[in-house]
């Protein structure tokens, strides 16, 4: 059972709008899975200047959601202008660990989704995240059926297990309208 917007104090931060120059774009094919984790454990994933949004309800009071995204970004391109892109040909697999319903410390209001770590199997994609401040790590990423694994040959497993992917959450095309 996923904790929802109604369970937290605050509100969504409206998107800034489309990137018209200087950004990157691509197609994301992937799976999202949610888990409720002990709030204290989740709060330790955040940097000092961020906090978990205060709870509005007593629904699952000691838990906070985390998101795991397993995906294969394709069709990567630099956004050169509002009407022109430069294809990069990049394709890779990744796993992203994110924490929704996060606020800047000592500030009420807008929620952010904090990206804790991104594991990617492409060195160029890892390097491409540096200017944006992403915590990207080069790793092997595999997800087939219910099984998923993220590992490094020297560091060992970062994550391994069988997941229950569940039902479709919503139509992604509806989010674009």
Language model segments and positions:
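N-terminal intrinsically disordered, low-complexity segments enriched in P/E/S/T
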Residues: 1-19, 93-97, 124-125, 130, ...
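Short N-terminal edge-element motif at the start of the domain
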Residues: 43-135
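N-terminal domain-onset segments
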Residues: 1-79
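Extracytosolic secretory-pathway proteins
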Residues: 25-37, 90-94, 164-165, 169-171, ...
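Internal, well-folded beta-alpha domain core
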Residues: 103-177
């Amino acid at each position: 059972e996923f904790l929802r917007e109604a369970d937290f104090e605050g509100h969504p931060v409206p998107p800034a709008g489309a990137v018209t120059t200087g950004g990157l774009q691509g197609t994301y094919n992937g799976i999202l899975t949610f888990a409720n984790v002990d709030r204290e454990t989740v709060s330790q994933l955040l940097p000092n200047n961020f906090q978990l949004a205060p709870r509005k309800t007593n629904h699952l009071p000691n838990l906070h959601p985390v998101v795991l995204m397993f995906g294969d970004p394709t069709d990567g391109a630099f956004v050169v202008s509002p009407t022109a892109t430069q294809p990069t040909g990049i394709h890779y697999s990744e796993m992203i660990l994110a924490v929704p319903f996060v606020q800047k410390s000592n500030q009420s209001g807008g929620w952010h989704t904090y990206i804790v770590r991104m594991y990617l199997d492409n060195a160029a994609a890892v390097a491409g995240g540096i200017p944006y401040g992403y915590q990207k790590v080069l790793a092997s990423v595999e997800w087939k059926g219910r099984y998923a694994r993220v590992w490094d040959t020297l560091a060992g497993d970062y994550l391994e297990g069988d997941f229950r992917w569940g039902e479709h959450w919503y139509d992604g095309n509806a989010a674009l309208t």
